[in-house]
Amino acid sequence: ANKCIIDCMKVKTTCGDECKGAGFKTGGCALPPDIMKCCHNC
């Protein structure tokens, strides 16, 4: 499986809806830039 997609899924599991859309740093969910980009591209 694609590591990026796996990381994205981990982030979505950890951060929930904060990881979806553009508001990656809302609700106390601050993600590293590489993971944010990964999640955004997922």
Swiss-Prot record:
Keyword RNA-binding (UniProt): no
Statement: the UniProt record of this protein carries the keyword Cytoplasm: no
Tissues with expression: Expressed in flowers but not in leaves, seeds or roots (at protein level).
GO biological process: defense response to fungus; defense response to Gram-negative bacterium; defense response to Gram-positive bacterium; killing of cells of another organism
PTM section of the record: Disulfide bonds.
Key words of the record: Antibiotic, Antimicrobial, Disulfide bond, Fungicide
Annotated function: Antimicrobial peptide. Active against fungal species F.oxysporum (IC(50)=5.7 uM) and A.niger (IC(50)=5.6 uM) but not against B.cinerea, F.graminearum, B.sorokinina and P.debaryanum at concentrations below 10 uM. Active against bacterial species P.syringae, B.subtilis and X.campestris.
Protein name, entry field: Antimicrobial peptide 3
Native source organism of the sequence: Taraxacum officinale (Common dandelion)
